[in-house]
UniProtKB/Swiss-Prot annotation:
Name of the protein: Small ribosomal subunit protein uS9
Gene Ontology terms, MF aspect: RNA binding; structural constituent of ribosome
Keyword terms, alphabetized: Ribonucleoprotein, Ribosomal protein
GO CC terms in record: cytoplasm; small ribosomal subunit
Any one GO BP annotation for this protein: translation
Gene: rpsI
Length: 150
């Protein structure tokens, strides 16, 4: 027979983490597809200012809102920073992905100990996928015209 030993599972505390003091705004850039986002992270109460609009106003889709807040939730700092962002190019999904990357990069500059958690969650990886170009002789990037044998 095999002996099974019990191990304690260590869980992190549910209370919010202690606030981090930063002396100047943290500025980072995130990119995805054609979108480029420049972010300024300042100590605050969790407000988002995206080109002068709120998060809910700029991204009405709840999936995009969750995607953007994910790095802050991962490191328990949802209500500790105000985020000012300038978004350029692309569509809603590309901009949301670029904003998530920029926020994750800013959080690392604030607290380098958060890097492993953000890296494990995949928030620091720049998504390299982009639209494949259309080729001549084809209708789209890969779609060929109908083939006729005779």
């Amino acid at each position: 027979m095999t002996d099974v030993t019990e191990t304690e599972v260590v869980t992190e505390s549910a209370e919010p983490r202690e606030p981090v003091i930063i002396d100047r705004p943290i500025q980072t850039v995130g990119r995805r597809k054609e979108a480029v986002v420049r972010v300024r992270l300042v100590p605050g109460t969790g407000q988002f200012n995206l080109d002068g609009r709120t998060l809910e106003n700029y991204f009405p889709n709840k999936v995009h809102q969750q995607l953007i807040k994910a790095p802050l939730v991962t490191v328990d700092r949802v209500d500790q920073f105000d985020i000012y962002a300038h978004l350029d190019g692309g569509g809603p999904s590309g901009q949301a992905g670029a904003l998530r990357l920029a926020i994750a990069r800013a959080l690392i500059l604030v607290q380098p100990e958060d890097r492993p958690a953000l890296k494990k969650a995949g928030f620091l990886t720049r998504d390299p996928r982009a639209i494949e170009r259309k080729k001549y002789g084809l209708k789209k990037a890969r779609k060929a015209p109908q083939y006729s044998k005779r």
